[in-house]
């Protein structure tokens, strides 16, 4: 058996060379392993989108990841937006850069970020000035035929090519290589001869690459279609952008050795370069934003002070709500606070809590509605004390350890709901406070999903729209269904493919391209705040249409490198509540405070029991209305349960019916052990919440709440090995507590079953509070509530119609638009609502402002006066 030739691919485009590269990262690593390559590089066009995914997928594979990029270098200044005929496309040359080490990574990160932020002209371009400032730690290859040296060689401008290569070799001493490719293109053969001349004259080392754009030779056709999708052309277009050969695949070392038989050193140098590239990331360090405490106070001390002061203030409200609160119960609050603070400090997260509290309290101080909580953070008393959340976790048995587990160190994740209209103001505040160069949103990638890829490929093949549309519509309407699964479920698709070679080509190509990244966009909520310039940690992308900056790594990988992200979510219901409260205060109750409601209001529960919940947060769908009329919630715990139960899992399992039957006494509530009653009493003996699983583990088997959270996670993931381990721990613990083994086994199995459907009670409770507030407003202040709801839904005619129907059902008259009485929004007039101009189709903002401005001088007497006084432009 002959020895494998030395070779590593150093010029390769993954799917993150959007609509140009067709290599999936996982497939790349698998193929490199199959070829027994010691390393492989990813060099996407002008970006590092896939760098972190690639690096992590290589871990444990035996393949060393080499992070790089094929950057675009402007022929002149990166700021010049004029085409330059000196370059092939008129705007940029190509250049391969590979990271040797962490310094190189930071420099490459800065370079590709600069391309988007400063040099974008069709492509994200850098220039030689910025390259010279950030060349350390990078190995440079002269690139393909579009590289400057190769381009000059192809035009027989060898002296200029030598001068250019000399410049690069001086900038990258011992780190600059002349790149050769063998792809059967005649122009490549010509360029190679002259590239060899340049290398000889300057004594520069050679390197062999293949500019891989797809994995296998057989993928060349699919790749051609991918290029058509990118350029909006069809395969029938002779002038379309295309690769003139089918050689740009991930060749084996043997194929590369055969192609470069004349330059064995070019092959050997690929391995030498790979040996020089030793970039390592620290995934154990969190990079917290710099939050400055007052002089003489540490972050720990600041959080301690704010939490104690905040809880003392909160207790004033708690005592008013629960007049029979005992000193022992009050002490319980401070004991819980102590436990949480110790855990937060021990885990090193005080700064995180202070940062979140700072921007939430800034929002509240500026009249921006903020939700009472979201996710597991609602289980934290510290979060409640420092006004991150507005739900007291103790009365509802919400667990801090579900949010932050001392036995499993991971970054806390506090998601925050803001008024949809003013969310951007909070992001702007954070950006200004921490620095524009340290804050940005997070990228996300749209992929070619089953129906979409059929349509894309159909267009590229120039097939009739009707035919393609008919095939695309055969894909079953199942969220996230793959084309492969669709072909199994819908035999008609296979029949069409068998009877028509064009349809077969369409589906075969669609299968090949499905799932590839199609475009970059911005994550709806995620914002990253770094301690230093963001490019130190992660490259930045700029959307050229909106101008917004995002990380080049998606959410998962941003968190993996230790950057701290915050989720700023927009929730329209908070705007509705805020506007309704303002209307109530402007009318009959100037002192009305929505945050001080008792949770046992009879009228609110009557409204819920009747299913009169149009406009009520989380409870307005027809299915939810049906559930409410059956369940008939009579306490706040029931609303929490409804929010948790209305999901496909519980509804399909029979546990919802069981819950209802037990609540109404039609089925007896039985507890296998008396210790379960305090835990399951509020849910009538049914395990509804993840927190209940944790409490059972603690009570019966002596788990710490941190350990119980690990058990909950294991049950959720259904890892057989971990489940077996946890089962032994549970049974052993139960035995120590004198619990019968058979009963303990039965309870463990019951927990495992319900863990599949169990919901996070903290999240349910926080959202139940918003639901209750909207129900209260609708029950007690229906005119104000529905006016606020109609105003918020003005842009959606269907919702306006539905809300007006709801007004009529509640006996509230909606008065028609009146040129002398309507405002932009819906107005409250006694027990009536005046229709707002903003909900009238084709009446724009400027027209409304012109009418309202003219009306300040008095009402309009007739149409003629209206036309005379209102600016008709």
Listing of model-derived features with the role each one plays in the protein:
Residues 69, 140-143, 816:
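Non-cysteine beta-strand/loop elements that form the S-adenosyl-L-methionine
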Residues 38-42, 51, 58-61, 214, ...:
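Noncatalytic, beta-rich nucleic-acid-contacting surfaces in large DNA/RNA-processing enzymes
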Residues 99, 112, 142-144, 180-182, ...:
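Short, structured patches in soluble enzyme cores that scaffold and shape functional sites
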Residues 2-42, 46-61, 110, 114-219, ...:
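Domain-core and long-helix interface of multi-subunit machines
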Residues 57-61, 82-86, 114, 195-196, ...:
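Short, hinge-like loop/turn segments at secondary-structure boundaries
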Residues 80, 89-96, 102-115, 623, ...:
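Covalent nucleotidyltransferase
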